[in-house]
Design a protein with these regions (language model features):
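Residue-level signal for alpha-helical context at structural boundaries
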Residues: 58, 123, 193-201, 243
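Juxtamembrane interface at the cytosolic side of transmembrane helices
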Residues: 228-243
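Acidic, S/T/G-rich, low-cysteine, solvent-exposed domains in lumenal/extracellular/periplasmic regions
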Residues: 1-191
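Hydrophobic alpha-helical transmembrane segments of integral membrane proteins
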Residues: 220-222, 228
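Short, aromatic-rich amphipathic segments at membrane interfaces
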Residues: 164, 169, 194-220
C-alpha cells in the first residue's frame, strides 16, 4: 500500500506512468486484492480482469497476438505490426470519467477470449479450451488501456502483461516498439515516437572465382611463409654483423 500511495502522489502531481500487471494467478496476491489494481479501478475506471487471455492465433494458446491498435500516437505507425503477450489478462474500462480520455489501445483478434475458469487451468486438468459466452469476455479482447487526464495532463498506460517487455520477448515483432513508444508518450516525449520501417537488405555470398581462389592459395602457401622466412634471414644477418 505504501508503494501505491507513492505512485498515486506521483500521478496526481502530473507524472506519467506505465503499468504492467500480470494475471492475478501468476502473482503473489493469489486470491487477495491487488492494491494497485484497486487504485486504477477507483481512480480511472480501469478493469484488470481476473482472467487469462486464450488465443489460438498463435501455436501457443496462452500467447495472445495483438493485431489491431486504436488510433493513438503510441500506435499510429504500428499498423501492420503484431505484438505478442504471453500469459496476459484483459484490461478494459468501465464507468464514466468525464475528465479522462480513455482508450482501449491494443486488441486481439475476434477468436480470442478472456478465460475466467482459472481453477481448472491451475489444476492441470485436461480440459478443452472453449469460451463461455455468458462468463468469459469474448474477442476482440483489450490488452492495454491508455488514459490522459484533461485537467492535470498526466498520462497512464496499463498493460495486462509484463512478459511482453522482458529480454526474451522485447525484440519479438512490434513488442519493443510498443514499449518504447508507451514510455515516450507517458513522459510527454511524442517527438521521440518514431517507427520508420527499415528496408530489408538482401545479402548474398558470391563465391570467388578460380583466378581469385588461385591468388588466395598462392598468398597463403608461398607469400606468407616467404615473408616470414625473409624476416628471419634479415634478423639473423643483423645479429651476425653485431656479433
Amino acid at each position: 500500500n505504501e508503494e501505491v500511495e507513492k505512485l498515486k502522489a506521483f500521478v496526481e502531481s502530473g507524472g506519467g506512468l506505465v503499468v504492467m500487471e500480470e494475471p492475478l494467478v501468476l502473482t503473489d496476491f493469489a486470491d487477495r486484492p491487488d492494491p494497485l489494481a484497486t487504485y486504477l479501478s477507483e481512480s480511472f475506471g480501469i478493469v484488470l480482469g481476473n482472467d487469462i487471455v486464450v488465443d489460438f492465433t498463435s501455436q501457443q494458446p496462452f500467447v495472445a497476438v495483438a493485431n489491431s491498435y486504436a488510433s493513438h500516437p503510441i500506435t499510429q505507425k504500428m499498423q501492420g505490426l503484431v505484438s505478442l503477450f504471453p500469459t496476459t489478462r484483459s484490461v478494459s474500462v468501465t464507468g464514466e470519467f468525464n475528465d479522462l480520455n480513455r482508450t482501449e489501445l491494443v486488441l486481439t483478434a475476434e477468436n480470442a477470449w478472456a478465460e475466467t475458469d482459472l481453477q481448472s487451468l491451475q489444476g492441470g486438468e485436461q480440459i478443452e479450451l472453449q469460451p463461455d459466452p455468458g462468463v468469459d469476455m469474448l474477442g476482440p479482447v483489450s490488452l492495454a488501456v491508455v488514459i490522459e487526464s484533461l485537467g492535470k495532463q498526466n498520462r497512464l498506460i496499463v498493460y495486462g502483461d509484463a512478459d511482453f517487455a522482458n529480454d526474451a520477448n522485447f525484440m519479438q515483432y512490434g513488442n519493443g516498439d510498443l514499449l518504447i513508444n508507451s514510455i515516450d508518450w507517458a513522459a510527454g516525449q511524442e517527438n521521440l515516437i518514431k517507427l520508420t520501417p527499415k528496408d530489408s537488405i538482401q545479402r548474398v555470398l558470391i563465391p570467388p572465382g578460380r583466378y581469385t581462389m588461385g591468388l588466395i592459395l598462392f598468398g597463403f602457401v608461398f607469400l606468407v611463409p616467404g615473408a616470414v622466412l625473409f624476416s628471419g634471414i634479415v634478423v639473423w644477418i643483423q645479429r651476425r654483423k653485431r656479433g
